[in-house]
Amino acid sequence: MNLFKIVTKNMRQRALATWLTGTSVALGVALAVAILLIKQGVQQRFEQGTLGYEMVIGAKGSPLQLVLNTVYNLDISPGNISWKLFEKLRDDKRVKLAVPFSVGDNYHGFRIVGTTDTFFKDFEFEPGRKPELAAGRIFNFKEDALKSAFQEAAERARERESKERGEEVTPAPEPAPVEHPFEAVIGSTVAEQTGLTNGEKFIAAHGVQPSAEAKEHTENPWTVVGILKPTHTAVDRAIYINLDSFYHIEGHELRSPTAAAKPEEKDNDPDPGQVSSIVVKLQSPIFAFGLYREINDREDAMAAFPAAEIRKLFDIVGNIDRLLLAQAILILVVAGVAIAVSIYNSMSERRREIAILRALGARRATIFSIVLLEAVTICVIGAAVGLVGGHLVVGAANGLLYKASGFVIPALHVQTLEWYILAVAVILGAISGLGPALGAYRTDVARNLAPSS
Amino acid sequence: MPDSNNKPILQLRNLRKSYRDGSGSLLEVIHLRQFELGTGDQTVLVGQSGSGKSTLLNLIAGILLPDGGEIVVNGVDPTKLSEAARDRFRAANIGYVFQSFNLLQGFTALENVLLGQMFGGGHGGADRAVELLKKVGLEHRLHHKPRALSVGEQQRVAIARALANAPPLVLADEPTGSLDTKNGAAVLGLLRQICGDGGHTLLLVTHDPQVMSSFEKVVRLEDLQ
């Protein structure tokens, strides 16, 4: 027989109250752990996601929107920028790599991204990690086909604008036939969730998000020619097509230039085409701020550093996290009060037991310890269950999270903060048990030993 | 029966205890000139209801402190000890049997006896606890909780618990008060026999004439005042 056995007997004797109060502690801790795990996991994934994207260039607007659109395939594109700017950046000595992206269609909610073969050959979405094929090959890309697609798109735009002005439309001369292979390389999540296999054809819908009214590009189905290995980044949730096929189809017209480029570039050479954004990798980080300023001085484009934008985003989201954590702590405090109330409520029946133990030779300090230990034990068990529960909840939610966002949170990763939560639970147990323990300490032995009539 | 001239186990001199009544005035419950018990004595202390019998036992056990006078148990005056030392002293030297058994309901018969040992240093361990329960005829009820035992069996467990640390002095406060005549007689016989076999001094308080008549040494509380 020892103190802990007495404590566990007491807890078992009041099993319902023990279970209820322990559960409330577990819920509070599970909530706190889940919030911490999700916050850290999401932030880590988002920050990791920016590693390969040193600088993103797109139309003027919100830098965060540009980053979300280009890096994470979220949100809508802020607009288009000129192909000339892409060419200028590609040829810039300071630039190691420039990859163009165009968005505008989806398949079952998965974004279709028009790009060049550079994306597969040279682009590292994380340092040292390029998109790798699990099956098939990458799409065929030829720059002359892209130029031809740009011409077609510009012609369609001209015809539409003439019609809108009520002018007679003079059909453009038939362009020289250029082959535009409608080929797609799909991310691992796309393959898993749509069931698309290599060689299979699919029809894209207009718009970056699914909609019942969206026009389907039935005339130009794409063929899956390659499936990528999982990267656990936004790449898994995208369908990559050759940029020329993107501009070859109806609806993907070149937009009228929203603003001019720098005046010296304005009239000399007409804009051959447009893209939604350009991801730039520099020869050296020392060029970053110079190029950043240069781009942002332009009236038609802006540059954004994804890592900085994501940090800003999490600074804002951090306040919501703190609010949720405060809520979890409040639940823990309420649980602590519940433990104190529960032990207090049982004090009338406990007083007799305490008096018996005292008559058997238990010291006041022993009685104090028994009651305190009971409150701490409930809190520690509740907190331990909550810690495991929090990880299990996140682990169970990972399936849904993966479907929704393409990444999972490392549910088994134990954070240092969790040990603090456990310590807080011990302190909370001690505080909640202190009042009842003092009451037990002061129990009048002689009065409580008398036979109850 | 051991000779009462042996080493005294309990000595009380000029013992006084008062309480404040509802109106705030002092009410003297105990004013005892002298009382002594030798090793192995079996004495019944009788008195009217409310005459202070239970208070006297609580004073001897060190649960209550006297307003004045001297209590010596097994050569030690527990009132001169710190509270913690007094608790340890009580666990090792005094066994207590109550009218209402006072068993812990969440614990089995064996665990209740082990609890009796726990605070007195675990005298004899589980083997002694089992042996004591066998002595009171409960070898088949070791793992039953009090709720599953009859009142007679519960009081037998209480007797085994009181003797768990082999205390020199056993105090019994109306031990048959909650039992019917047959059970009462059986429990009393058992208590006296085990105390006699182990050489434990027994001080039993009662107002039951039948219990009184079975003892050779009967002391009236009013005669000691």
Short names for language-model regions:
Chain A
Residues I331-V334, Y344, R351-N398, I427-L428, ...:
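Transmembrane alpha-helical interface segments in multi-pass membrane proteins
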Residues A17-G41:
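Short, strongly hydrophobic transmembrane alpha-helices
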Residues M11, R358-A365, T443, S452-S453:
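Short helix-to-coil transition segments within interhelical loops
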Residues T23, D321-S342:
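Internal alpha-helical transmembrane segments of multipass membrane proteins
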Residues N106-T116, E126-P257:
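Hydrophobic secondary-structure segments that place a key small or acidic residue at a functional site
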Residues D92, A212-D321:
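Mechanotransmission and gating elements of multispan inner-membrane complexes involved in transport
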Residues L36-P131, R137-I138, K142, A154-H180, ...:
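Hydrophobic, regular-secondary-structure patches
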Residues A384-V424, L434-R447:
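Short helix-loop junctions at transmembrane helix boundaries
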